[in-house]
Swiss-Prot record:
This is Uncharacterized 52.7 kDa protein.
Length: 459
């Protein structure tokens, strides 16, 4: 039985794709090709007709299944011809779909698949946990919580996990995860040591592993740990002797080494990367005493601090008043006087007297604008109130005091003048008060004139 003219023409023109289509259109064509021995034809159709199931069924004995096995296969084709495929070659394909691997993983060489793919699904990892090369999978895949659970945890190499993966807080605080990790291996990479891991070691009695590496840890990157474990500073310096001296790279927050104050603090700490880390720490510290000590330092090195950055958080209050003060409230030499430092700076730490005051001048507002836009003086209602409460002086005191704020000309033009405050009456500009002040009161003006005339008569 002769093949069709179209098939002969396709073979003559080496249009092998057309020939493959024609091959299954008639029995004559099929019989003809079964006896057709051109190696170029069979090599071509083996490489390019890999998902034409009818063709593969009809010419299974003529097809080069190694070529088919190296080609992208559908799940249906692989299922139909599973016995004929060379699964070692299929395993080396770089673009197998996850569903394909999941269905045929028991036929695939999963060691090869482990080395080829970096995106094996969790379902594949769980189903073929015993067959995968976990050293390769750990290197190339994102870590998953399920690695620490059966069946994967029964086969995975947790030393490889410790060496190559970074544990975040969720893993460290999960006993079934962290207990599987060799911390000695994990902490060889100092960059992987986090606040959460340090706290875990101290809390759960894993201090031996921490002590081994403590001399290399950049403690300045872990300042908040010292708030939770204040004794850690002495442990590092005295008990373990792993930190011979505090440096910009390894020092805790300054509050924790205030008793051993370095002579060159400004050069070694303020003029270094430590200072930015310390400012960030101070903005969020939970230790009020440490926060006050930080303000003591900021006050002494005022030009080296971005006060707006400090004000963004809620750790400090009324920083504008401290910023406007003309000199440090406590000199640097008094670093070891805890009571004096707290008395001066504790009121600027959240929870102090000014915590809920709505009368604070914003740090980015000038004194002139503050006089024009805010009520900086509230006149006392009686002599008794003035003598007992000094209400008229309280708002200026709250915002940094007279040295930083008092301007008699601006006060005369914009603020209330207290009729019971002799300094107000004697120093305010009476003409400015009468001409410009929106709070002008005739009786106060008359008292002002009288007080100033008495001074002139005395002079």
């Amino acid at each position: 039985m002769a093949p069709t003219r179209a098939l002969r023409l396709a073979l003559k023109k080496q249009d092998y794709a057309r020939a493959a289509d024609l091959a299954i259109e008639s029995r004559a064509n099929r019989l003809f090709l079964l006896d057709y021995h051109d190696p170029d034809f069979w090599a071509y159709v083996s490489r390019n007709c890999y998902n034409r199931d009818k063709f593969l069924s009809a010419f299974g004995d003529k097809i080069d299944w190694n070529e088919v096995s190296a080609s992208p296969l559908t799940t249906a084709t692989a299922r139909t011809f599973a016995a004929k495929l060379n699964w070692a070659r299929v395993s080396r394909q770089p673009f197998l779909r996850q569903q394909f691997i999941y269905e045929f993983g028991d036929r695939l060489d999963m060691q090869v698949v482990s080395a080829t793919y970096n995106n094996l699904s969790l379902a594949v990892q769980q189903k073929f946990a015993a067959a995968l090369n976990w050293d390769r999978v750990v290197l190339s895949h994102y870590m998953l919580p399920e690695w620490f659970e059966p069946p994967i945890c029964d086969f995975i190499n947790f030393d490889a996990v410790a060496k190559h993966k970074h544990l975040d807080k969720s893993y460290i605080n999960a006993p079934h995860c962290i207990n599987k990790i060799n911390l000695g291996v994990y902490m060889r990479n100092i960059n992987k040591i986090s606040d959460a891991l340090i706290v875990y070691c101290l809390r759960e009695g894993r201090v031996h592993e921490l002590r081994v590496v403590s001399g290399a840890v950049p403690w300045a990157d872990h300042m908040r740990v010292f708030d939770e474990y204040p004794g850690l500073a002495n442990t590092l310096r005295l008990d373990w002797a792993s930190v011979p001296a505090w440096t910009a790279a390894c020092a805790p927050p300054a509050h924790y080494f205030r008793r051993s104050w370095p002579a060159a603090f400004e050069r070694e700490f303020v003029n270094s990367t430590y200072w930015d880390k310390f400012i960030e720490y101070a903005s969020g510290t939970t230790n009020a005493a440490s926060a006050a000590f930080a303000l003591f330092l900021f006050d002494n090195f005022k030009s080296r601090v971005d006060w707006r950055r400090l004000q963004v958080g809620d750790r400090f209050v009324n920083l504008a008043a401290l910023h406007r003060a003309r000199g440090p409230l406590v000199a640097l030499e008094a670093a070891g006087d805890d009571e004096r430092v707290w008395r001066a700076y504790g009121r600027f730490v959240s929870g102090g007297d000014a915590a809920h005051c709505e009368l604070l001048i914003p740090i980015n507002m000038s004194v002139r604008d503050a006089y024009r836009k805010m009520a900086l003086v509230q006149a006392c209602a009686s002599q008794h109130e003035h003598d007992k409460a000094r209400t008229c002086e309280r708002r200026i005191a709250l915002n940094g005091g007279e040295d930083a704020l008092l301007n008699w000309n601006l006060l005369s033009a914009t603020q209330q003048v207290c009729p019971f405050n002799l300094r107000h009456l004697q120093n305010a500009n009476a003409q400015t008060y009468r001409r410009d002040n929106p709070h002008y009161v005739q009786d106060v003006y008359e008292k002002m004139i009288a007080a100033q005339m008495n001074i002139n008569e005395f002079l």
